[in-house]
C-alpha cells in the first residue's frame, strides 16, 4: 500500500468512524428489534448459556446466535447499555467499508476503491443499520467478505465467510453468495473455477463451522 492509498484509507476511516460511532449510545433502544437483541445477549451473560438464546427466561431460536454473541462480548467490555448493544453493528459496518476499500483498490485502483467505499459509507440505509442493534451489518460484512474472497480467489476464506454469515442469519448466508457466484460462472463460462474452488471440501468446511449450532 503506497502513501496515497494509506492517506485515502485514513481519511475514509475518520469519516466512517465519525459517521457510525458518534452518538451511538445517545438514544434508547428502539422497538421492535433492538431491545430483543440486547435482552437476549444480556440473558446469555446472566444464565451463562451462550448456546441456547432466550428472552425473558424463555428459549427462542428466531435467529442464529452470532449477533447475540457479539453483543454479549461488547457488554462484558462496555457494560449493559445502548452503546454495547449497538457497538457490534457499528464495528461491522466500519469494517465492511474498510474491507471494500482495500479489496476494490487491489482489484482496480485507489480511486475506484475510495469512491466505492465512500458511497457505501454515506448511504442512508447503511448509516441507519450501522447505528442499530440489528443483525444486518454483521450479515453484510460476511456476505461481502465471501464475494470479495471469491474475486480474489481466496476460496477457503470464502467458505468460512459463508459459514459465519449462516451463523448470523441462517441459510441466506450460503444461498445468496452461492447464487451470485454460480451466475457469474454461468455468464462468464469459467467452469474451471468449480474445480479450483474445491467445492466438496469447501462445503465440508462450511458445515463444520455452521452446522453445530
Name what the model sees in each region.
Residues 1-213:
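Membrane-integral, polyisoprenol-dependent glycosyltransferases
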Amino acid at each position: 500500500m503506497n502513501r496515497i492509498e494509506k492517506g485515502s484509507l485514513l481519511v475514509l476511516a475518520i469519516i466512517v468512524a465519525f459517521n457510525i460511532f458518534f452518538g451511538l449510545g445517545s438514544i434508547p433502544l428502539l422497538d421492535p428489534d433492538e431491545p430483543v437483541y440486547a435482552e437476549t445477549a444480556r440473558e446469555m451473560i446472566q444464565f451463562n448459556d451462550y448456546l441456547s438464546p432466550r428472552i425473558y427466561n424463555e428459549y427462542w431460536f428466531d435467529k442464529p446466535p452470532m449477533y447475540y454473541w457479539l453483543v454479549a462480548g461488547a457488554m462484558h467490555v462496555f457494560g449493559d447499555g445502548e452503546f454495547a448493544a449497538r457497538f457490534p453493528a457499528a464495528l461491522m459496518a466500519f469494517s465492511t467499508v474498510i474491507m471494500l476499500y482495500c479489496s476494490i483498490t487491489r482489484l482496480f485502483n485507489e480511486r475506484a476503491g475510495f469512491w466505492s467505499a465512500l458511497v457505501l459509507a454515506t448511504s442512508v440505509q447503511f448509516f441507519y443499520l450501522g447505528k442499530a442493534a440489528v443483525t444486518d451489518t454483521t450479515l453484510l460484512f460476511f456476505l461481502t467478505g465471501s464475494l470479495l474472497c471469491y474475486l480474489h480467489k481466496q476460496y477457503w476464506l470464502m467458505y468460512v465467510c459463508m459459514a459465519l454469515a449462516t451463523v448470523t442469519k441462517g441459510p441466506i448466508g450460503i444461498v445468496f453468495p452461492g447464487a451470485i457466484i454460480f451466475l457469474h460462472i454461468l455468464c462468464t463460462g469459467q467452469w474451471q473455477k468449480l474445480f479450483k474452488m474445491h467445492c466438496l471440501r469447501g462445503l465440508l468446511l462450511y458445515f463444520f463451522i455452521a452446522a453445530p449450532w
